């Protein structure tokens, strides 16, 4: 590839607690990635002192996780690795307390999920049982728009690389992911041993029967042997540059000598100096004077970029975290009076009825919203209605709900602007439900503030 920039992709790793996620992820990062030898040697030494011979890779990840949990920001390079085609970032692995919330409000949308399944006797069955986390994670990934999936069948060494066991698991898992919504034909099934590092990067020599994986997607047929091959064969993501701008604000700074600087991640569209932007729901319109990222001036900010931009005649009191910036001339963002969403209740101890008012985390907004009407209960898999106007919904149920925010907020339909159309419902310090927004009733407010800078720019 020479010096050309490789495409960046984001991976999320899902699967049951003991499926070997850490070991497998650790191995990829260890072998293809961002962990330098010095760090590895340090970890290896510590592992030996603790008698953790099994260290190999999980230890690396445990160290990173522990540091992350304690709020030590670790060098994010540690969560990166490379394939021939891609720069890969592992954006999260479950088990992390806020996994579900991260996956929804997530700083980034995953392009692909790797589902890790343990092949050991009894282990596989436990992971995929009715109440299994595996089902929940796979369903979440699918519901939240992670379109591509890779299945890694791990711990094959514990089955002596048994072909019948592999085939049995492939058959079961195919049925399982089909129920969730994925097409098994588009999914590579890769036998591996994360612990031994077998068939991860180099083809295994332990499975003469294994001819490799195949998948067929919109981009054609692909085949390969190893897990790394499967990651390299992910269909390249399309970044939503063509859509109108949506930029949820993470913070707003006041910088002396410069003025007001909102900061956030461009989710769709582009932002450039000279553009006249509208903030919703605060309904303020002004001109963008400059855009920068990592202290460098940009001619434009693209989807995925975390940018700061300087705006004139707007005080820090007028725009805040949770507001959304958009192009005033191209489908500008608006506040909403209410919205309808498909809500899936994950773990709520009681019943949820009309009037329930938990906090919603949607992009960077964190606002209490009332479940004002339960419109219909639906089958999670097919999306078909099974009951109109149910009185209550409980854990495991999915429903279309009319939601009313307690104060102005800006959201969008998931089909129009995915990152602004999915949310986590938080209550009792945990994620009790997730939702995907179907339609939005926008506030048709007129007479918002239009700054002098915006009026001038309009005349140009």
From Swiss-Prot:
Q: Which InterPro entries match?
A: EFTu-like_2, G_TR_CS, GTP-eEF1A_C, P-loop_NTPase, T_Tr_GTP-bd_dom, TRAFAC_GTPase_members, Transl_B-barrel_sf, Transl_elong_EF1A/Init_IF2_C
Tell me the PANTHER family matching this sequence.
TRANSLATION FACTOR
- UniProt region (G1), positions on chain: 15-22
Please list the residues that carry the modification N6-methyllysine: 3, 31, 317, 391
The similarity comment for this entry is:
Belongs to the TRAFAC class translation factor GTPase superfamily. Classic translation factor GTPase family. EF-Tu/EF-1A subfamily.
Where is the segment annotated G3? 92-95
Q: What is this protein called?
A: Elongation factor 1-alpha
PROSITE patterns attached to this UniProt entry: G_TR_1 (PS00301), G_TR_2 (PS51722)
Q: Where is this region: G2?
A: 71-75
- Map out region (G5) in residue numbers: 193-195
């Amino acid at each position: 590839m020479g010096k050309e920039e490789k495409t960046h992709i984001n991976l999320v790793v899902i699967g049951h607690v003991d499926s070997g996620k850490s070991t497998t992820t650790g191995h990829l990062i260890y072998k293809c990635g961002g962990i330098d030898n010095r760090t590895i040697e340090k970890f290896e030494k510590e592992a030996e002192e603790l008698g953790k011979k099994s260290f190999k890779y999980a230890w690396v990840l445990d160290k990173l996780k522990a540091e992350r949990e304690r709020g030590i920001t670790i060098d994010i390079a540690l969560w990166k690795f490379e394939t021939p085609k891609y720069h890969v970032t592992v954006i999260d692995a479950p088990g992390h307390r806020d996994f579900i919330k991260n996956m929804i409000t997530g700083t980034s949308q995953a392009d692909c999920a790797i589902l890790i399944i343990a092949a050991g006797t009894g282990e596989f069955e436990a992971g995929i049982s009715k109440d299994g986390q595996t089902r929940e994670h796979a369903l979440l990934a699918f519901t939240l728009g992670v379109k591509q999936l890779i299945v890694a069948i791990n711990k094959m060494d514990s089955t002596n690389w048994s072909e019948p066991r592999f085939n049995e698991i492939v058959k079961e898992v195919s049925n399982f992911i089909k129920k969730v919504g994925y097409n098994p034909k588009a999914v590579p099934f890769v036998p591996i041993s994360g612990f031994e590092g077998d068939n991860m990067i180099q083809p295994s020599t332990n499975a003469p029967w294994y001819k490799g994986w195949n998948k067929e997607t919109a981009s054609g047929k692909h085949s390969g042997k190893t897990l790394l091959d499967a990651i390299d064969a992910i269909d390249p993501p399309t970044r939503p540059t063509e859509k109108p701008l949506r930029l949820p604000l993470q913070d707003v700074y006041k910088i002396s000598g410069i003025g007001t600087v909102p900061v956030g991640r461009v989710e769709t569209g582009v932002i450039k100096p000279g553009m006249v932007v509208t903030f919703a729901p605060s309904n303020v319109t002004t001109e963008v004077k400059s855009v920068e990222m990592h202290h460098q001036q940009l001619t434009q900010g693209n989807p995925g970029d975390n940018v700061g931009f300087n705006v004139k005649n707007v005080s820090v009191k007028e725009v805040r975290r949770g507001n959304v910036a958009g192009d005033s001339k191209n489908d500008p963002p608006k506040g909403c009076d209410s919205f309808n969403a498909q809500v899936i209740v994950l773990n709520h101890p009681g019943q949820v009825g009309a009037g329930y008012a938990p906090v919603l985390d949607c992009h960077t907004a964190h606002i209490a919203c009332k479940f004002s009407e339960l419109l219909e209960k639906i089958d999670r898999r097919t999306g078909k209605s099974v009951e109109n106007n149910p009185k209550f919904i409980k854990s495991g149920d999915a429903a279309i709900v009319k939601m009313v925010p307690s104060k102005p907020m800006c959201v969008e339909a998931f089909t129009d602007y995915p990152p602004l159309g999915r949310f986590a419902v938080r209550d009792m310090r945990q994620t009790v439900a997730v939702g995907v927004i179907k339609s939005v009733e926008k506030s048709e407010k007129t007479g918002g503030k239009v700054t002098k800078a915006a009026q001038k720019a309009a005349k140009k």
